[in-house]
């Protein structure tokens, strides 16, 4: 039974999310497919996605798990959340989508229903740092007791040392609101963020704080109000050092394996630093990552977690085994500059082999290709027996310069595009709701749209398998004449060009995100 203080705290959190809910989005780094791919890279096989059991703790309206449920009809997906408002609306959306493999439950994680059984993938995103220690331990209890033997979980949380800078911003916003309250101002959730923004804008403009802190403060002002409210004004915001987080995990028979954002576990740093840290930390991967966090001022982590008993089965190392790399699927699209070089992060790629890899990936896009297949194609083209394709593929993955998947993805090309019926109701939700509470997302989580262009939605719904692009062009031209669709033209372009361009964009969007497979 939770103590009295925790119960009061839970009520405050519940009211906060009932009164000011987040828009519910899909987060790529939390998805079961991402968890599976990263662990496959480290030699650990997790359960098949197609019939997996998935749990999300703190699911909001379900926006993070609905796309997975849509794509995997044989999977069973459950979300729990404190906010009854969000759960009720989320279940209404699910019912309208006609989904029978997903349900949302209004439940406190401390009262988790043991009858829900084991899960292959557990997601807890944007929760852990915003609850007290008793609830944190309750979350870890659920993961320990309900994660299947070879399952994996995702936990995201704010981390030190990076968050120490941001605490200055949180403190000044809370200080200003408290000061104004004491002077008789009516401060509540509807205006707290507005006053808070004023405080950090003042700080950003006139403070003698160092540029790193100022940069972080300026970044806050660009965020949505609902994000600032829950990130900086919640009763709880408890960042942790990674080593502290892992200590809590070990107390529950769990371990931090790796960050879902691989760059945080395997950063691109000098050999000198790497050698010093290896000498200092040996095989202690958490200690090494903690040093990385100190060096690089990390403020947020997305830990992939599993049972401590699985540690010996996982190659937790920057040196990925070729046998584990061979079956990883990659895809990417790259453009050359006017001088004929690929440019990545403002750097011209002049290495011949890397350029050849980018050529092959771009030619194959939007289909995926295994690293093994990629290596063979490079060998065929450069006529050299030896190459560094595997090392370069790892570099691209660590640097987030290529999409990586555990399963092959093949785009379906059709003269008459047909949206898969399972996505029809999903698209219709965004057509009929001017203020959707979930974001439109691909099932991989690589795409999130808060708002979709109405013209694009109109085009996508015409992809029913009976119409060519030319047919759709003529239909839209007629709709524009009748005033049913408004086409906005930039100077120098015609409405016909705009329509054709939008049709091409929509076709690419549907195919690249596999909405027609």
Regions found by a protein language model. Give the residues of each.
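Conserved SAM/SAH-binding beta-strand->alpha-helix loop
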Residues: 83
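Conserved SAM-binding loop of SAM-dependent methyltransferases across substrates and taxa
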Residues: 61-74
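A short glycine-rich, Lys/Arg-flanked "PGG" loop and its adjoining helix->strand segment in the class I
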Residues: 137-149
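Long, charge-rich, low-complexity alpha-helical segments
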Residues: 267-310, 343-517
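Conserved alpha-helix/loop element of class I SAM-dependent methyltransferases that forms part
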Residues: 19, 27-52
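Conserved class I S-adenosyl-L-methionine
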Residues: 155-183, 195-205
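Conserved SAM-binding strand-loop segment of SAM-dependent methyltransferases
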Residues: 98-109
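A short acidic, Gly/Pro-enriched loop at the edge of an enzyme's catalytic core
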Residues: 114-121
């Amino acid at each position: 039974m939770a103590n009295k203080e925790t119960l009061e705290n839970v009520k405050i959190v519940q009211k906060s999310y009932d009164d000011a809910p987040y828009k519910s989005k899909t987060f790529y780094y939390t998805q079961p497919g991402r968890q599976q791919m990263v662990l496959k890279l480290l030699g650990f096989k997790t359960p098949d996605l197609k019939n997996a059991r998935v749990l999300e703790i703190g699911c909001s309206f379900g926006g993070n798990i609905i796309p997975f449920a849509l794509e995997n009809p044989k999977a069973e997906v459950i979300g729990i959340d404190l906010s009854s408002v969000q759960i009720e609306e989320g279940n209404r959306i699910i019912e309208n989508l006609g989904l029978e493999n997903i349900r949302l439950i209004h439940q406190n994680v401390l009262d988790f229903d043991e009858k829900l059984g084991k899960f292959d993938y557990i997601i807890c995103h944007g929760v852990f740092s915003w609850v007290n220690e008793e609830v944190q331990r309750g979350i870890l209890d659920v993961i320990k007791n309900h994660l299947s033997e070879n399952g994996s979980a995702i936990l995201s949380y704010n981390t030190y040392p990076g968050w120490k800078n941001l605490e200055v911003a949180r403190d000044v916003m809370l200080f200003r609101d408290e000061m104004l309250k004491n002077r008789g101002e009516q401060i509540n959730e509807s205006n707290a963020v507005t006053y808070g923004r004023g405080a950090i804008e003042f700080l950003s403009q006139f403070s003698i704080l160092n540029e790193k802190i100022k940069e972080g403060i300026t970044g806050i002002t660009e965020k949505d109000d609902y994000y600032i409210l829950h990130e900086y004004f919640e009763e709880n915001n408890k960042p942790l050092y990674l080593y502290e987080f892992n200590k809590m995990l070990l107390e529950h028979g769990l371990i931090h394996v790796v960050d879902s954002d691989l760059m945080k576990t395997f950063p691109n740093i000098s050999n000198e630093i790497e050698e010093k840290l290896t000498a200092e930390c040996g095989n202690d991967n958490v200690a090494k990552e903690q040093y990385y966090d100190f060096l690089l001022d990390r403020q947020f982590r997305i830990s992939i977690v599993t049972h401590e008993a699985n540690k010996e089965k996982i190659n937790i190392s920057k040196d990925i085994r070729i046998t584990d790399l061979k079956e990883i699927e990659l895809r990417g699209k790259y453009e050359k500059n006017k001088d004929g070089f690929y440019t990545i992060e403002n750097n011209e790629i002049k290495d011949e082999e890397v350029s050849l890899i980018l050529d092959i990936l771009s030619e194959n896009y939007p289909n995926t290709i295994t690293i093994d297949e990629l290596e063979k194609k490079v060998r065929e083209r450069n006529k050299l027996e030896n190459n560094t394709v595997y090392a370069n593929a790892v570099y691209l993955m660590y640097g987030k310069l290529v999409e990586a998947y555990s399963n092959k993805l093949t785009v379906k090309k059709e003269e008459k595009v047909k949206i898969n019926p399972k996505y029809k109701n999903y698209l219709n939700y965004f057509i009929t709701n001017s203020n959707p509470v979930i974001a439109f997302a691909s099932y991989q989580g690589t795409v999130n749209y808060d708002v979709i262009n109405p013209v694009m939605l109109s085009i996508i719904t015409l992809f029913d398998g009976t119409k060519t692009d030319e047919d759709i062009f003529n239909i839209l031209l007629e709709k524009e004449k009748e005033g049913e669709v408004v086409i906005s033209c930039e100077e120098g372009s015609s409405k016909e060009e705009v329509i054709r361009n939008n049709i091409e964009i929509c076709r690419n969007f549907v195919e690249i995100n596999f909405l027609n497979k």
